[in-house]
């Protein structure tokens, strides 16, 4: 992995950061997935770009070696949940978008499963240590959930939300009950 004294960033920012169309699309993605900054988008984009680059490099290999490596890459991406079926092809890898990786983040899955009312509350529950994956407390909202881990996402056993999860009605004041 290299010398720890020479740590490098794992993402690559946009070449032209001030294009209005790019700014609007990034802002929409940040709102949809509850991201804190654009670096999280750029990291997802870089990871997906790396997978697409691997798929393109497979096309140049001899057929025997290509079949082995293609099967390995497809298996890995299926286990990560980025591909829909095990019978996917390289064309499916080349069609990956950063949204497909953002859908696999723990924050997004916690919200989609209904453990949190909003995507922002999902992030807060994760950071505060209320969410566990397979019994292990995970405090990183950007944790990429594998396909086989998806069913084991729940509240951490010692969390106060384990027996009383947040629901849509909590925190709202009924105007009729308030009685001005």
UniProtKB/Swiss-Prot annotation:
- Cellular component GO terms, alphabetically? small ribosomal subunit
Q: Which CDD domains match?
A: S4
Which keywords appear in this protein's UniProt record, sorted alphabetically? Ribonucleoprotein, Ribosomal protein, RNA-binding, rRNA-binding
**SUPFAM superfamilies tied to this protein:** Alpha-L RNA-binding motif
User: Positions of the region Disordered?
Assistant: 155-180
Q: Which GO terms describe its biological process?
A: ribosomal small subunit biogenesis; translation
Coiled-coil region: none
Asked if the Swiss-Prot or TrEMBL record annotates the protein with the keyword NAD, the reply is: no
Under the heading Pfam families, the entry gives: Ribosomal_S4, S4
Q: Which InterPro entries match?
A: Ribosomal_uS4, Ribosomal_uS4_arc, Ribosomal_uS4_CS, Ribosomal_uS4_euk/arc, Ribosomal_uS4_N, S4_RNA-bd, S4_RNA-bd_sf
Q: Name one GO molecular function term.
A: rRNA binding
Q: Which residues form the S4 RNA-binding domain?
A: 104-166
Lineage, top-rank taxon, reads Archaea
Write out the similarity annotation: Belongs to the universal ribosomal protein uS4 family.
HAMAP family in the record, alphabetically?
Ribosomal_uS4_A
Protein's job: One of the primary rRNA binding proteins, it binds directly to 16S rRNA where it nucleates assembly of the body of the 30S subunit.
Give the record's subunit note. Part of the 30S ribosomal subunit. Contacts protein S5. The interaction surface between S4 and S5 is involved in control of translational fidelity.
Please state what the protein is called: Small ribosomal subunit protein uS4
The upper taxonomy is: Archaea, Thermoproteota, Thermoprotei, Sulfolobales, Sulfolobaceae
Per UniProt, what is the name of the gene that codes for the protein in this document? rps4
